[in-house]
Curated annotation (Swiss-Prot):
Disulfide bonds join 27-91, 315-382. Residues 21-414 are lumenal. Changing residue 115 to A: Abolishes the recruitment of PDIA3, CALR and B2M to the peptide-loading complex. The gene is TAPBP. The chain crosses the membrane at residues 415-435. It comes from Homo sapiens. This is Tapasin. The N-terminus is required for efficient association with MHC class I molecule and for a stable interaction between MHC I and calreticulin. Binding to TAP is mediated by the C-terminal region. Heterodimer with PDIA3; disulfide-linked. Obligatory mediator for the interaction between newly assembled MHC class I molecules, calreticulin, PDIA3 and TAP. Up to 4 MHC class I/tapasin complexes bind to 1 TAP. Interacts with HLA-G-B2M complex; this interaction is required for loading of high affinity peptides. On its own or as part of MHC class I peptide loading complex, interacts with ligand-free MR1 or MR1-B2M complex, providing for stable MR1 pools ready for metabolite antigen processing.
Length: 448
């Protein structure tokens, strides 16, 4: 009985895992509106359905209501693992026309410029983005929608390109690892049989977008001979198929490694997989950061007499990136009433100081107003907020000492003890010297 319960629990767990994530992805079909800009129409991807018929969608054009068949499983697997609390993904569909790759280094993928007849027909490019993934898929829909029992169009996934790190954040000076995977299934048996058994040749391209232009960082065509552009900035890619099944489907890896990231390397990265006449591309946004260090001067005590202003306080905020988004706040903690409040006084910030590693530093200044006796023991704090820090920020503080209201400090007590110890030793030494001299005089008198 226990084993039956265990099997039931495992089955329920597996069913939950399989059914996780959205079953339907709402999309927008985007097309050119005959010179009047872009037109958008609603569509949807039905990734899976329960028992029975697909849910009817009378609000959609049947050609844009797609029941997705994914032989390689990459598209559906990405959404089975989609976190429940994550925002809904943004999805766009558009027409796609199979063409040879335009880059010269990828010309070996398509020796014949004419697209094979096996790739004729309608194609759709689906681009999906969210905080947890960026995905591009090529779908081949059936020519006509299925009429019964629900108006819906069957579509087969041919190529999927995917990253699970669409917005990587890398600490300044550390290596960036941008993951990329892809999956391919030949669209027809004729297309598969026209090629040699095993996965087809492919091209991998990584670019960084800068001022509207793509800067090529790395290009590779594993298994093909030919002159390739040299990799830039020490970039390396793990470009290979994961398996060598004779007829597919196949999965591959195009993960990108960039060493010792600097600020100029942040921005938009475009990863493209080229197959013969087919392409898929995803976008990643790389952000570089370095959390600031904070220190306060004077470091321990700020002394002032009643009615006098304490010395100027200097908050050093050092070696951080990016330079924007920094806030410096001054607080008075433990003042009258024991509460924390915004510190009064004149405050200003210095200009940014730039360092060789791309980070910056600045200093915040506060000239407090004259103090009162009630403020003795209060603490001035410099709190900083920066995009690289938690919401609470980071702070440093110094204690305010009002003259005449405090007993001797620990340092003073230690000094007094040492002084007393030295005086005691001196007195004892003088006493021993006096006794010695007296003894010597008595000895001389007896000798005479």
């Amino acid at each position: 009985m226990k084993s039956l319960s265990l099997l039931l629990a495992v089955a329920l767990g597996l069913a939950t895992a399989v059914s996780a994530g959205p079953a339907v992805i709402e999309c927008w079909f985007v097309e050119d509106a005959s010179g009047k800009g872009l037109a958008k129409r609603p569509g949807a991807l039905l990734l899976r359905q329960g028992p029975g018929e697909p849910p009817p969608r009378p609000d959609l054009d049947p050609e844009l209501y797609l029941s997705v068949h994914d032989p390689a499983g990459a598209l559906q697997a990405a959404f089975r693992r989609y976190p429940r609390g994550a925002p809904a993904p943004h999805c766009e569909m558009s027409r796609f026309v199979p063409l040879p790759a335009s880059a010269k280094w990828a010309s070996g993928l398509t020796p014949a410029q004419n697209c094979p007849r096996a790739l004729d027909g309608a194609w759709l490019m689906v681009s999906i983005s969210s905080p947890v993934l960026s995905l591009s898929s090529l779908l081949r829909p059936q020519p006509e929608p299925q009429q019964e029992p629900v108006l819906i169009t069957m579509a087969t996934v041919v190529l999927t390109v995917l990253t699970h790190t669409p917005a990587p954040r890398v600490r300044l000076g550390q290596d960036a690892l941008l993951d990329l995977s892809f999956a391919y299934m030949p669209p027809t048996s004729e297309a598969a049989s026209s090629l040699a058994p095993g996965p087809p040749p492919f091209g991998l391209e990584w670019r960084r977008q800068h001022l509207g232009k793509g800067h090529l960082l790395l290009a590779a065509t594993p298994g093909l001979n030919g002159q390739m552009p040299a990799a830039q900035e020490g970039a390396v890619a793990f470009a290979a198929w994961d398996d060598d099944e004779p007829w597919g489907p196949w999965t591959g890896n195009g993960t990108f490694w960039l060493p010792t990231v600097q600020p100029f390397q942040e921005g938009t990265y475009l990863a493209t997989i080229h197959l013969p006449y087919l392409q898929g591309q995803v976008t990643l946004e790389l952000a570089v950061y370095k959390p600031p260090k904070v220190s306060l001067m004077p470091a321990t005590l700020a002394r002032a007499a009643p009615g006098e202003a304490p010395p100027e306080l200097l908050c050093l905020v050092s070696h951080f990136y990016p330079s924007g988004g920094l806030e410096v706040e001054w607080e008075l903690r433990g003042g009258p009433g024991g509460r924390s409040q915004k510190a009064e006084g004149q405050r200003w910030l210095s200009a940014l100081r730039h360092h060789s590693d791309g980070s910056v530093s600045l200093s915040g200044h506060l000239q407090p107003p004259p103090v009162t006796t009630e403020q003795h023991g209060a603490r001035y704090a410099c709190r900083i907020h920066h995009p690289s820090l938690p919401a609470s920020g980071r702070s440093a503080e110094v204690t305010l000492e009002v003259a005449g209201l405090s007993g001797p400090s620990l340092e003073d007590s230690v000094g007094l003890f040492l002084s007393a110890f030295l005086l005691l030793g001196l007195f004892k030494a003088l006493g021993w010297a006096a006794v010695y001299l007296s003894t010597c005089k008595d000895s001389k008198k007896k000798a005479e």
